[in-house]
Amino acid sequence: MSVTWEAPGGWEDLGWEPLAPGVGRLRLPVWDCTVGLVAGAEGALLVDAGSSVAEGTRIRQEAEELLRAGHPAPGPEGTGRGSGRRVTHVALTHPHFDHVLGACVFAGAEVFAAVGAGAPLTSEDGRDALRADAVANGLTAGAADGALELLTAPGHEVHDDHVLDLGGGVRPLLANVGPGHTAYDLAVLVPGPRPVVFCGDLVEESGAPQAGPDAVPSRWAAALTRLLELGGEDAVYVPGHGAVVDAAFVRRQREELSRRFGTAW
């Protein structure tokens, strides 16, 4: 199969939704969770990683099939186009099971999360909470335990903003925009003629945003203001769950959150 990043059909043939040249996303079954892919000439960024070892493995296989098709020229692993054919970086938007438990299968990739996100992924209390949430939402205990056994802390914590250089002028920005949905919310901006913003669960389209016990409601609306500042009026905003939206949708959700929690933005 011949795939070019400029041709949306290549993404769709592999089950992914094209968002911009070199940028796409996959909506996963069961929880309708989004994972994103940003392809550069020398590397690729995955945004979130699925809910289990099995789901992470599927994501990795599909993403790397797409990357190989988009970078058909051979190259040594770790250099030039060779590293552009595999996932070299993973950004975790927040430490909830449906977004992080698949990260353990991306050996060799650099993993990024908001500062402090390592604690709920590696501490005993954090792992117990992750497991309980996963099982309560339908993941089998065995699948949860298998992923948690392999899960490690992110290698890089983002304090403010951090730019990745994926080669070929592809430079996504990782932005610590929270707290809001959790205490550790990371967004990803992919600049371009029409920017793409991966919002994590700060924005949800398929239902009202979910505020669990680890949410920070007093800061959530302000986090959406930061997302709007990142992307601007013309960006494509990618929720953690549901269809892609525009800036007007994000503003409406910000207003709803402000009313719901009695906070300003």
Give the positions of each predicted feature.
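Metallo-beta-lactamase
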Residues: A44-L45, S51-V53, A69, A119-N176, T225-L228, ...
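Divalent metal-coordination and catalytic microenvironments
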Residues: G22, V38, D48, A63, ...
